[in-house]
């Protein structure tokens, strides 16, 4: 598929972090100064996840008040509109934006306001995914998820767990997400972005609807069978995973393997600005490097719709746009 066709294709994005995807003009406006591209995005020679994470400092400063949060949400939907994303689930960590004046309720409401304005102006259907952070206390994470649960179906669509997977394995968070499931809150979980496949097993067993990344089940047919049987979506973020060295080389990236195993793979950006990417660029990348056929692009969009945290009426609407 040519780039222009890919750009105009109606697209679905399920794994996109708000703070890692703010546009340079938005960040410059918020900071009141010119920002160099290298302050925001990693180069092709990114050496590690730590180098990658350094790029979140500036955008993080831009979302510490309600105007910044609302503006950030609108800014991201504006970017998505430029490449015909018709449904998007945007994730962020409310606790990272909390201040003495702004609790997680106000944080979540501010993001929803920006999303609603973006939906009104661009026609993009959206859902907000709230991220619990691995380094935060169980009490704080649970407090945030309980608050977010009040907005389920009114902007919020799911919860997530993000942060340093290597330091905090999934086994430490089973109680939180068992409780989240009891509350009727859907969730996706970052798991297998680094080398521990047990995190994927634990995530599936606790009831995750989707897995963020899932790279660690490469070559492991047993876990792949478990994921397939559970019907979980696999949110793959190719360019980001290569930059953070989740895999050592392009040849090791398991997109073709996962598709051939019948997993519900979707393609995502992860962090548009930090990775200097877009959904169009990601799709072009996987076609050029992994022999992804045109019909498989549509299959992955269908996988994204099938595993989206939204109601059937919106799924039907998006399906019609793809035909």
Positions of predicted regions on the chain:
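Metal-cofactor-binding active-site regions of metalloenzymes
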Residues: 1-185, 194-199, 205, 209-210, ...
């Amino acid at each position: 598929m040519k780039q222009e066709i890919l750009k105009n294709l109606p697209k679905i994005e399920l794994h996109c972090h708000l703070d890692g995807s703010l546009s340079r003009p938005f960040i410059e406006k918020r900071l009141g100064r010119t920002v160099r591209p290298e302050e925001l995005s990693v180069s092709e020679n990114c050496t590690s996840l730590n180098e990658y994470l350094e790029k979140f400092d500036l955008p993080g400063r831009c979302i510490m008040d309600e105007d910044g949060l609302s503006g950030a949400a609108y800014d991201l939907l504006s970017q998505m509109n430029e490449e015909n994303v018709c449904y998007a689930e945007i994730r962020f960590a409310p606790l990272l934006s909390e201040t003495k004046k702004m609790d997680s309720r106000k944080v979540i409401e501010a993001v929803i306001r920006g999303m609603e304005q973006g939906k009104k102006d661009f026609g993009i259907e959206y859902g907000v995914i709230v991220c619990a952070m691995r380094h935060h206390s169980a009490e704080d994470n649970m407090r945030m998820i309980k608050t977010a649960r009040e907005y389920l179906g009114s902007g919020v669509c799911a919860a997530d767990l993000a942060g340093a997977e290597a330091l905090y394995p999934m086994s430490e968070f089973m109680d939180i997400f068992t409780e989240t499931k009891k509350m009727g809150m859907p969730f996706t979980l970052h798991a297998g972005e680094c080398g521990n496949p047990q995190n994927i097993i634990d995530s599936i067993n606790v009831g995750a609807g989707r897995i963020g990344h899932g790279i660690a089940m490469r070559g492991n047919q047993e876990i792949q069978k478990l994921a397939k049987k559970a019907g979980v979506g696999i949110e793959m973020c190719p360019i980001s995973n290569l930059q953070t060295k989740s895999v050592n080389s392009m040849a090791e990236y398991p997109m073709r393997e996962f598709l051939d195993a019948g997993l519900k793979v979707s393609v995502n950006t992860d962090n548009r600005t930090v990775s200097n990417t877009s959904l169009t660029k990601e799709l072009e990348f996987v076609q050029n490097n992994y022999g992804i056929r045109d019909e498989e692009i549509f299959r992955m969009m269908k996988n994204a719709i099938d595993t989206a945290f939204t109601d059937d009426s919106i799924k039907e609407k998006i399906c019609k746009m793809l035909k």
